[in-house]
């Protein structure tokens, strides 16, 4: 049976009629493809550029302390608003939620432009706290769109599409400091033009967010609609979010959520930041985020097409990420034996001048990006397999991002307090390793095959 025939069957299950007829125009603004793609470009402009800025190590500054403290503020606030973001999304709808979230990214980049001249941390820390609030809103909206708008049997493909567009922002964001600081091979911090360019992209993200449609306006190619959401009162949403702490499905995801951003401070500050000079950090980030695009596409294919059984695809995806993750972290262990905070490299690596010495750390850093995308895309696929309506999934995504941010807030302070680099690496490796068997249990007990019941036909 082809895809079109499947769509007709789905429509018939829900009564047929005009509402469930397949749209004649497959290239529509209200299609899941257009909406997920637009969501990708919103994140391209805002968190994509934020990732590129963070990936410079220390926010592009010679001393990472201000950036570490600002990031701690970001993720502390994100912990709260990540949990509540689904409630805001369900009350405000996608456009207001996303626009409010995106606007805080512009302020954050502007705070580092200010810091470039005045070296006062207060503005960066306050802007970081506001960004944490905004990021909670943005990612709750993103999670609902990405996991509930696509058809159930193609969620991995749409996650890969989103992740590729989103991480293209990191690629372009890596090119910005690389190009604007190319002739400054001995510079310690990026110039003003770099921060201004980031701010322009982030403001574009604010404008794009107004194009995201509510779930009830999105029509799939088979004529089915996404689950209609009856927006709830804040008190109702607060109670629903609190109940997630007793939800066994969410408890099994907690270690993966905690681990999924914990390693950023180590990778950005202590691999890219300590081993490479300024312009090479931007060069490296192009490939770090480019590898994320490849990783998301690869794992998306596995999670959607490797086996007919959804559960088998889940087990296969987790196993593949576990094997690749073990290999990459083992490579990181070998690399970490070469330096420490007490014994830093005498000269930082340059992509043009360091020759073969540059290759090993560069490939490792790029591999970290590959693993990050595979790991997070896998977890998002699992979350998407637990439900099909945007209200539930916005809460699940908000819970995931909230726990993720709590871990990141701790990680940035771990780095600020100069914890030995080898200890940081071992903790990062251990956290991801612990999460794999728990995700296997999640699939075993709570992920159902497409034909187990009719829940996956919900429209």
Swiss-Prot record:
Chain residue ranges for the region called Disordered: 1-26
Record flagged with keyword Transmembrane helix: yes
Keywords for this protein: Membrane, Transmembrane, Transmembrane helix
Transmembrane segments: 38-58, 73-93, 96-116, 122-142, 159-179, 195-215, 251-271, 287-307, 314-334, 355-375, 425-445
Superkingdom: Eukaryota
A cellular-component GO term for this protein: membrane
Cellular localisation: Membrane
Topology relative to the membrane: Multi-pass membrane protein
Family of this protein: Belongs to the unc-93 family.
PANTHER family reported in the protein's UniProt record: ET TRANSLATION PRODUCT-RELATED, UNC93-LIKE PROTEIN C922.05C
Name of this protein: UNC93-like protein 1
